[in-house]
């Protein structure tokens, strides 16, 4: 199917400054993400940034760059400007691949695009994977999602949701809940160009500000986000220095196994 990938990238990450250009196995992390997007079969892959250092490195590797405003407070707003600059037709499917997901399987990019196409009432399509341990469930850097019976998002949170009161009570020894499946949100989104053009007009929501999760703006204003279970489980992205070292080790292992 036909879709385009836009990778928003900013240099000034608070926890890992210069994150898109940090070295992973001899190349900037952002270029690993670009390569994954290219392997997905997207008809076009471009990077949207406000930083000339990122622009220079990406262009030197033959990748299209869209320079955007330094005023954007979210990756989605950056994508919205890129879509406006490119003047894509309204029904064009745009995939937002986060610049800190260097190990994202290309098949998941295609899955998100296909999921949006098959759910015409959804404003956004995204993916999730099961959470299998307490460390992930209680990690605020890992975003959790609760879905309704049709797979549409009810809420995203950095907290463990839903709160299994009986299982998490101290008297039970904080046992793992057996009556509910927990899901981790995977950091990519599929939109139609028409929705991205409307998105900047939505006021920032208090939920979005509280959780620092821009997808909550859509839910707050009545939008619908379909969340499919990913066909394969990707490693978490890079949010911290510990994540960076973990990904470096995974890449070393992959290279060793390949040889």
UniProtKB/Swiss-Prot annotation:
Q: Which reaction does it catalyse?
A: 3-deoxy-alpha-D-manno-oct-2-ulosonate + CTP = CMP-3-deoxy-beta-D-manno-octulosonate + diphosphate
Q: Name one GO cellular component term.
A: cytosol
Q: What pathway or pathways are given for this protein in its record?
A: Nucleotide-sugar biosynthesis; CMP-3-deoxy-D-manno-octulosonate biosynthesis; CMP-3-deoxy-D-manno-octulosonate from 3-deoxy-D-manno-octulosonate and CTP: step 1/1; Bacterial outer membrane biogenesis; lipopolysaccharide biosynthesis
Quote the subcellular location field of this record: Cytoplasm
What family does the Swiss-Prot or TrEMBL record give for this protein? Belongs to the KdsB family.
> Which keywords appear in this protein's UniProt record, sorted alphabetically?
Cytoplasm, Lipopolysaccharide biosynthesis, Nucleotidyltransferase, Transferase
Biological process, per Gene Ontology: CMP-keto-3-deoxy-D-manno-octulosonic acid biosynthetic process; lipopolysaccharide biosynthetic process
Which top EC class is named for this enzyme in its record?
transferase
Q: Which domain of life is it from?
A: Bacteria
Keyword Glycoprotein in record: no
GO molecular function annotation = 3-deoxy-manno-octulosonate cytidylyltransferase activity
Q: Where are the transmembrane segments?
A: none
Name of the protein in question:
3-deoxy-manno-octulosonate cytidylyltransferase
Q: What does this protein do?
A: Activates KDO (a required 8-carbon sugar) for incorporation into bacterial lipopolysaccharide in Gram-negative bacteria.
**EC number(s) reported in the record:** 2.7.7.38
Organism in which the protein naturally occurs: Nitrosococcus oceani (strain ATCC 19707 / BCRC 17464 / JCM 30415 / NCIMB 11848 / C-107)
